[in-house]
């Protein structure tokens, strides 16, 4: 299996696990759970995500990791790349409500994750303007 085929297979497995699930702090349906599952599909052994049931709980867990933001947390585990270098299966961060949102990059500005205009986890095709808001990208 080529590197690209492996990335596509991991991204499809992540999509199958999360697509259609509404965002839910208490049911482990958040972007950090999405990223951790995806990283495992890509062969990374990340620590388990402790249980949290609210945005406040998530903030406390970030502080316990010595970071304030999700991009800072990603910097601890993955090499940062320019958004233009993203391949299928890489991680992207975009501004969100209260937190930055982490998404899995597909192709042609399509990302898997939760979006303010969607009720559940889905593939979001970003406009050029939306894509330009990318706050960070990481090679998985």
Where are these regions (language model features)?
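A generic structural signal for solvent-exposed, polar alpha-helical segments
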Residues: 29-31, 120, 137
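N-terminal capping segments
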Residues: 1-64
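Glycine- and charge-enriched low-complexity intrinsically disordered segments
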Residues: 122-140
